[in-house]
Amino acid sequence: MYDKFMIYLHLNGLHGEAKYYKYLMSQMDFENQVADEIKRFCETRLKPAISCNTLTAESLNTLVDSVVCKNGLLNPYAKEVQFALQYLFDDDEISKRDQDGFKLFLLHNYDRCENMEEYFLINNFSIADYEFEDMFEIVRIDCRDLLLLLAKYNM
């Protein structure tokens, strides 16, 4: 469940980044450098996320930083991760104190899968299969949309 939970949050973060890039593309307020960054984002972040059911160590570190971040000015990835996490907390009616406890526990145990799995079991954290699968589909669509927008831009 821990892996599923973290991948779900990661996919939400990637969706947030994709929305940001789609906004940039719609404004046509960018240069070739931004188009190259969007292509790199699709190739190195979106495609691996939808083809693998795992997180890299770098992605896991970024994800944990995004979960525990208290800065109000968040990047699109961190903002969407926190929205998704809050949605899950609200859906399971988890108190503010327990939310803070989860974040603290995650910060100190994210690299200890057994501890995290046990924590999820004890606290009955879960994500519906359809929500998890929907996030994969959303990120697939984001990737396709960005690549289509880039193709139009490069014409």
Swiss-Prot record:
It holds the Pfam family DUF5505. InterPro entries: DUF5505. It comes from the Viruses. This is Uncharacterized 18.5 kDa protein in FP-SLP intergenic region. It comes from Autographa californica nuclear polyhedrosis virus (AcMNPV). The lineage of its organism: Viruses, Viruses incertae sedis, Naldaviricetes, Lefavirales, Baculoviridae.
